[in-house]
């Protein structure tokens, strides 16, 4: 069976607690592939483990990279998340279009990644232009939508 589980990529996360919270949410939806790009407080981080509520399997397998280019070089479909309207060249999709594209892509053997920016500022335009698409996820539905590709059967 094809592995359709996405990678969650946190670019320049600022607090270990937010990494732990992300891992906890990922575990709740069966997503275990977490990558960090240049975490401000370094990795590993005790604060992440303290708040992760048992998501050690996610935290223990985190991959850390210095640059976004390094952390996404094997990702064949990168979807950047943003709350702002962007005028840079990346095509915006609604969440349902993004899920469908991600599912189709993984069924054809591709690796997908959802890219999230720093807590305080979000993704820079330089980060966004490296993505294939952008999406804006309604806050109260974000975890449901990100887990959607893992619910599909091939």
Residue ranges and their predicted role:
Residues 7-19:
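Short, glycine-rich nucleotide/cofactor-binding loops
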Residues 11, 37, 82, 135-143:
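Short beta->alpha connector loops at strand-helix junctions that form conserved
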Residues 19-28:
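Histidine-anchored nucleotide/phosphate-binding helix
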Residues 33-39:
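Short internal beta-strands
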Residues 46-123:
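S-adenosyl-L-methionine/SAH cofactor-binding core of RNA-modifying enzymes
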Residues 111-143:
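Hydrophobic, well-structured mid-protein blocks that either form specific transmembrane helices
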Residues 144-154:
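Single conserved hydrophobic/aromatic residue that forms the stacking wall/gate
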């Amino acid at each position: 069976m094809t592995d359709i589980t996405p990678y969650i990529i946190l670019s320049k996360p600022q607090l270990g607690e937010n990494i732990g919270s992300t891992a906890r949410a990922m575990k709740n939806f069966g997503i275990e592939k977490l990558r960090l790009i240049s975490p401000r407080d370094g990795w590993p981080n005790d604060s992440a483990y303290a708040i992760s509520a048992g998501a050690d399997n996610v935290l223990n397998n985190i991959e850390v990279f210095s640059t976004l280019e390094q952390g996404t070089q094997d990702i064949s479909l990168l979807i950047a998340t943003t709350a702002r309207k962007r005028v840079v060249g990346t095509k915006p999709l609604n969440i349902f279009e993004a899920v469908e594209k991600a599912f189709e892509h993984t069924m054809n053997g591709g690796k997908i990644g959802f890219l999230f920016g720093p807590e305080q500022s979000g993704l820079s335009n330089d980060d966004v232009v490296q993505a294939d698409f952008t999406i804006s996820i309604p806050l109260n539905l974000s975890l449901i939508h990100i887990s959607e590709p893992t619910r599909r059967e091939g």
